[in-house]
């Protein structure tokens, strides 16, 4: 899929909390993360793309129902997974029940970023919901919490039916332009784009 950087812009305002609450009120798993083959494949590619065998502390904002959180628990000593919707948190906690190294919390981003630092950050299908200002705050705040030499994995949906729309292509271009990040791995197909960056310094 051929794209030109800058051919779409972020939403003027970040998608509201009410928007996401409404999605969960209409359907337990709004994006069918637990059952859709494309998401299962995306998660498998994401896990295979992590450069290191094991990480000390992982931050996963926008964890939804916790499918990727379960997989990250196998590779990380500690996982902090967060979502803004109470119902998503309930489901993610159920999915990770029995995994003592996973903590699921409710957080509204970018206002409620976590304390401490991480050697892995995993962001999936989140950044294109943010306004330009909130995206900048989210990236700056998240990267401030990523340790030097730590990895950031981002994976986002590609809108193959409407290739001019603001999607994963655009938010990953913003990530790639962020100072202090070194590209490590890139995967792109008709369904999603995935990048792994390493923090320099």
Predicted regions and their residues:
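Class I (Rossmann-like) S-adenosyl-L-methionine-dependent methyltransferase catalytic domain
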Residues: 1-53, 57-59, 65-114, 130-144, ...
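Short glycine-rich loop/turn motifs that provide flexible caps or phosphate-binding loops at active sites
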Residues: 61, 123, 149
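A short acidic, Gly/Pro-enriched loop at the edge of an enzyme's catalytic core
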Residues: 113-121
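A short SAM/SAH-binding and catalytic strip from SAM-dependent methyltransferases
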Residues: 120-133
């Amino acid at each position: 899929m051929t794209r030109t950087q800058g051919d779409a812009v972020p939403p003027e305002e970040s998608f509201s909390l009410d928007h996401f609450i409404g999605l969960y009120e209409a359907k337990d798993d709004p994006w069918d993360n637990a059952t859709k083959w494309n998401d299962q494949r995306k998660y498998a590619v994401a896990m295979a793309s992590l450069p290191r065998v094991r990480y000390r502390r992982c931050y996963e904002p926008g964890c939804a129902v916790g499918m990727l959180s379960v997989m990250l628990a196998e590779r990380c000593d500690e996982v902090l997974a967060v979502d803004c919707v109470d119902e998503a948190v309930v489901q993610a906690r159920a999915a990770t029940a029995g995994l003592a190294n996973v903590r699921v919390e409710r957080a509204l981003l970018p206002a409620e970023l976590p304390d401490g630092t991480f050697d892995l950050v995993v962001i999936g299908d989140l950044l294109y919901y943010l306004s330009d200002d909130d995206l900048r705050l989210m990236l700056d705040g998240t990267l401030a919490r990523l340790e030097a030499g730590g990895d950031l994995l981002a994976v986002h949906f590609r809108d193959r039916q409407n290739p001019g729309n603001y999607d994963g292509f655009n938010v990953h271009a913003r990530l790639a332009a962020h100072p202090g990040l070194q590209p490590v791995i890139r995967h792109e197909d008709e369904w999603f784009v995935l990048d792994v960056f390493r923090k320099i310094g």
